[in-house]
Amino acid sequence: MAAAPQQSVHPSLPSSTSTLRLLISSSPRRPPPPPPRARRYNRLAASASAAREMPWPHVLTVAGSDSGGGAGIQADIKACAALGAYCSSVVTAVTAQNTAGVQGIHVVPEEFIREQLNSVLSDMSVDVVKTGMLPSIGVVRVLCESLKKFPVKALVVDPVMVSTSGDTLSESSTLSVYRDELFAMADIVTPNVKEASRLLGGVSLRTVSDMRNAAESIYKFGPKHVLVKGGDMLESSDATDVFFDGKEFIELHAHRIKTHNTHGTGCTLASCIASELAKGATMLHAVQVAKNFVESALHHSKDLVVGNGPQGPFDHLFKLKCPPYNVGSQPSFKPDQLFLYAVTDSGMNKKWGRSIKEAVQAAIEGGATIVQLREKDSETREFLEAAKACMEICKSSGVPLLINDRVDIALACNADGVHVGQLDMSAHEVRELLGPGKIIGVSCKTPAQAQQAWNDGADYIGCGGVFPTSTKANNPTLGFDGLKTVCLASKLPVVAIGGINASNAGSVMELGLPNLKGVAVVSALFDRPSVVAETRNMKSILTNTSRT
C-alpha cells in the first residue's frame, strides 16, 4: 500500500500545537502603549466608527403572501421601505390571488412558522412585530410563544380575517384566541369596521358613535391602543378612523379618494404604524403618519390600472416619482393641504417654554395639514437648525413644511416651499431659485395682488387679516367683504388668515367662498398651554363645518 502523502508545512509556520505554544510564550513583549495624543486619536477614530454603525429600525411582518403583490407581506415590505424601516418576514400562508379575489390558500405548517420566527428573532434585532394573516389557532399560539421567548418593543396586530374582495383568510375559531391571548400582548390593534364587528359577535357598526363603542369594547380585551378604521363605511363623506387609548377618543379624518386601487390599505397602514414605532415615534404620531401615507399613496395611485378585477393595488413608492427625486415634475401641492394651516411664532413658544420643534410636533399631532415656520426673532443658524429638525418631523408625517420669507433657509433644509409677502421677493423670483417642485404662497389683500401671484407662478395665496390681530403690526383688517372680494377674483386656492380662532373659524368656512380651502392660525394654536389640544379642537371645528 502506498504511503500517505506527507502534509506540507510552510517553514515560517508552526507544525504542531506544542510548537505554537512555544512561539507564543517566547514571543517578545508587547510594544509600549502609544503616547497620549495617539491614544486620543484612537478613541476618536473608534467613536467615529461607532457613530457610523447606525441602527436600522426593524419591523418583522408575520403574514400571508399575496401572489398579486397588493397586500400581505408584499405590501408590508414596500410600506416599511417607503418609510425607511427594514422589514423581515415570516410567511404564514401562501395565497393565489389577484385583483379579482383569492383563488387558493396554502397554510404553512405551524412548526415551520415557528422555525422562521426563531431564525429571525434569535439573530436580528427586531424592534416591532406586525401581524397580518394568522390563519389558525395554532399559528396564533406559535406567535405568542415566540414573542414571550423573544420580546420586542411593540406588537402591532392587524386582525386580518377577510380580504378586500370578501374572501375568508382566517378560521372563525381564531377569534377567541385573538381576544383571549394575542390582544393582551398588543400595543395596538387595527381592525376595520367589518373585522371589529366579527370580533364583537356581529354587532352593527354604521356610525362614528358605533366605532367608538367598538373601540372601547375591543380595548377591554387587553391591547394598549385600538384603532377602528372607517374606510369601509362608504356612505361617509370622508374616511374617519377612531383611535382609543383607554382614556380618550380621537377621530382621525382624511379625504376619501375615489379609486378602485385600495387592495392592501389595511396591511399598509399597520406596517406604517410599525415602521414609525420602530423609529421611536409615539403611538398617536405613528398612526397619523400612517394615515397620511395611505391617503397620499391612494391619491397618487387613483388612476393606475393593474389587472382586470375590481380591487387594484396602489403605489407604495410614489414618492420616488415626486420632488426632489424627479426634478422635472410639477409641484406636488394639493389645495386641501391648506385646510388647517399652522403658523409658528417664536415669542409665543418661548412664553410657554416650547422649542420650535416641539411646537411643530404638537401641531401635527393635533391635525395640522400644513406648517409654516415664521421665526422673525431667530438668528440664521438657530433658525436653520430648527428648520432641519422640523423638516424631519414633517417629512415623516407627510405634512408640508414652508418657510416664511427666508428662501435661503428653505434651500438649506430642503423645505417643501416658501411663503412670501408683498414686500418680499416675488413668487417668480422665488420659483427661479427653488425650482418647479416646491410650494410657493403669497400674501394678498386685493384682486390685483391675487392676479399678480397667479402670473408669477404661485401655488396659493394667503388673504387677511380677516379679523384684527396682534401678530402683525399695522396690518389692516379686510373682514368678510375683503376676503370675499379676493376669493372671487383669485385663480389660486386661498387660505384665510388673521385673528382666526376657535370662536370664528367656523364662520369663515361657512361663507362657502370659491377657492377658500382653509384657515391659517397662529395665536389660537401657539399662544396656548396645549398646542395639541387646540389644534385638535380647531380641526374638529373645521371638519364639522365642512360637512354641513
UniProtKB/Swiss-Prot annotation:
4-amino-2-methyl-5-(diphosphooxymethyl)pyrimidine binds at Q372, L373, R374, E375, K376, N404, S443, K472. SUPFAM superfamilies: Ribokinase-like, Thiamin phosphate synthase. Keywords: ATP-binding, Chloroplast, Kinase, Magnesium, Metal-binding, Multifunctional enzyme, Nucleotide-binding, Plastid, Thiamine biosynthesis, Transferase, Transit peptide. Its cofactor is Mg(2+). It is found in: Plastid, Chloroplast. One of its GO terms (molecular function) is hydroxymethylpyrimidine kinase activity. Residues 1-47 form a transit peptide. 2-[(2R,5Z)-2-carboxy-4-methylthiazol-5(2H)-ylidene]ethyl phosphate binds at T469, S470, T471, G499, V522, S523. Pathway: Cofactor biosynthesis; thiamine diphosphate biosynthesis; thiamine phosphate from 4-amino-2-methyl-5-diphosphomethylpyrimidine and 4-methyl-5-(2-phosphoethyl)-thiazole: step 1/1; Cofactor biosynthesis; thiamine diphosphate biosynthesis; 4-amino-2-methyl-5-diphosphomethylpyrimidine from 5-amino-1-(5-phospho-D-ribosyl)imidazole: step 2/3. It is an enzyme of class 2 (transferase). Mg(2+) binds at D405, D424. NCBIfam families: HMP-P_kinase (TIGR00097), thiE (TIGR00693). This is Probable thiamine biosynthetic bifunctional enzyme, chloroplastic.
